[in-house]
């Protein structure tokens, strides 16, 4: 599961947005393990997102 193309987009340093929670602002990916992405969002701090249930929009790849 960790090698799925969708999970590979969310590497540490990538910038993302959660379309269902626009007030969270832009977040920076901290880690992605087994489809769970830890993100530090500008307006709400750290959140752990399960990609099986919540969609994320990739804004910018890391590096």
Tell me what each language-model feature is:
Residues 34-35, 54:
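Beta-strand-connecting loop/turn residues
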């Amino acid at each position: 599961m960790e090698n799925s193309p969708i999970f590979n987009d969310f590497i540490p340093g990538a910038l993302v947005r959660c379309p269902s929670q626009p007030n969270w602002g832009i977040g920076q990916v901290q880690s992605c393990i087994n489809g769970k992405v830890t993100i530090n969002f500008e307006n709400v701090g750290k959140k752990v997102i399960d990609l099986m249930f919540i969609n994320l929009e990739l804004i910018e790849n890391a590096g």
